[in-house]
């Protein structure tokens, strides 16, 4: 579904296209540019693209809620790169720094340390907490303004966030750090919704954007309870689910409060009889044909995540 009711954001932007992608556009073999700059902007301005046109979409998991999505023509988007808290309020969550990967668009859902390390990747453009509509080539991003979940779900943090930070975390008077913008990325004929740490029941005005998305990325266990996830899935009826925001051995520390989602994944298979795909790598390629007829299929990266 193409969203036409949100006001467009008019921007001239930069992106990265691989040499293979530019070859698809021109029909000729074009080697990748040795320079990391906006050279490919000229190409995409000339060729454009259609986000609804079917094609292969690559999804790479960089841990936590960070996913690199590559469109059929090579536009790249990275969601929610992570870092450790610099204020001293929270302990060290991550063993390493986020890798300095090259990407066209860096996108964040909200201003928390585990989602907003937008300066770590070598991004040609940064869209922080996008609200509205943005289009580039064969990617269209729709940002939906809502609110962060204002009380952590057990066993995330035994502490109360409002008391720790001495700020108001719940609407309507929450600080900006507890705003959240759900991001819907449309490309290759697929609509992929990145939930961020949004509350379990968004503003009803957002429902028609979220219903029947193809892929829904949800922060299972640590942010949302299983009952909340079940309610979201029933309400929006996605073709596929990807759990995020969970404990990864080799990435997260024991004091992070992040939890395993193995139990939730097992329940999806045994209790809900979902088609669970346990992946053996940190990347996944999807297309509309692959998901046709699917309902609540689970793609689980397990402990596989990209490290560079």
Predicted regions mapped to residue ranges:
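Pre-active-site segment of Zn-dependent metallo-hydrolases
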Residues: 38-56, 60-107, 111, 115-126, ...
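Sec/Tat signal peptide C-region and signal peptidase I cleavage site
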Residues: 19-23
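Binuclear metal-ion centers of metallo-dependent hydrolases, dominated by the metallo-beta-lactamase
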Residues: 177, 240-308
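Positively charged n-region of N-terminal signal peptides that target proteins for export
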Residues: 1-5
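Cysteine-centric segments in proteins
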Residues: 24-32
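Bacterial N-terminal signal peptides
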Residues: 7-17
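Beta-strand-turn-beta hairpins that frame and shape the catalytic cleft
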Residues: 51-57, 71-76, 135-141, 184-192, ...
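Active-site-proximal loop/helix segments of hydrolase catalytic cores
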Residues: 165-236, 244-249, 253
């Amino acid at each position: 579904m193409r969203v036409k009711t949100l006001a467009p954001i008019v921007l001239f932007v930069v992106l990265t296209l691989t040499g293979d992608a530019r070859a698809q556009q021109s029909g000729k073999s074009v080697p990748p540019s040795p320079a990391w700059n906006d050279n490919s902007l000229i190409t995409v301005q000339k060729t454009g693209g259609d986000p609804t046109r079917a094609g292969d979409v690559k999804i790479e998991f960089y841990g936590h809620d960070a996913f690199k999505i590559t469109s059929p023509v090579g536009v790249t988007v990275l969601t929610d790169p992570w870092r450790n808290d610099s204020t001293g309020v929270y302990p060290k969550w991550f063993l390493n720094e986020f890798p300095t990967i090259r990407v066209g668009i860096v996108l964040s859902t909200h201003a928390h340390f585990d989602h907003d390390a937008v300066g770590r990747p070598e991004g040609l453009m940064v869209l922080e907490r996008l609200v509205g509509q943005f289009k580039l080539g064969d990617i269209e991003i729709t940002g939906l303004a809502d609110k962060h979940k204002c009380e952590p779900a057990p066993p995330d943090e035994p502490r109360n966030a409002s008391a720790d930070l001495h700020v108001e975390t719940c609407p309507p008077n929450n600080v900006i750090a507890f705003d959240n913008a759900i991001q819907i990325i449309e490309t290759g004929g697929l609509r992929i919704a990145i939930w961020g740490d949004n509350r379990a029941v968004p503003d009803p005005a957002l429902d028609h954007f979220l219903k029947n998305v193809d892929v829904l990325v949800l922060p299972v266990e640590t942010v949302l309870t299983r009952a909340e996830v079940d309610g979201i899935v029933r309400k929006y009826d996605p073709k596929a689910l990807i759990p995020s925001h969970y404990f990864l051995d080799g990435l997260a520390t024991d004091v992070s409060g992040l939890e395993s989602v193995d139990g939730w994944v097992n329940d999806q298979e045994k209790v809900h009889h979902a088609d669970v795909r346990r992946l053996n790598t940190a990347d996944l390629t999807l297309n509309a044909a692959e998901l046709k007829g699917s309902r609540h299929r689970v793609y689980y990266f397990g402990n596989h995540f990209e490290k560079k």
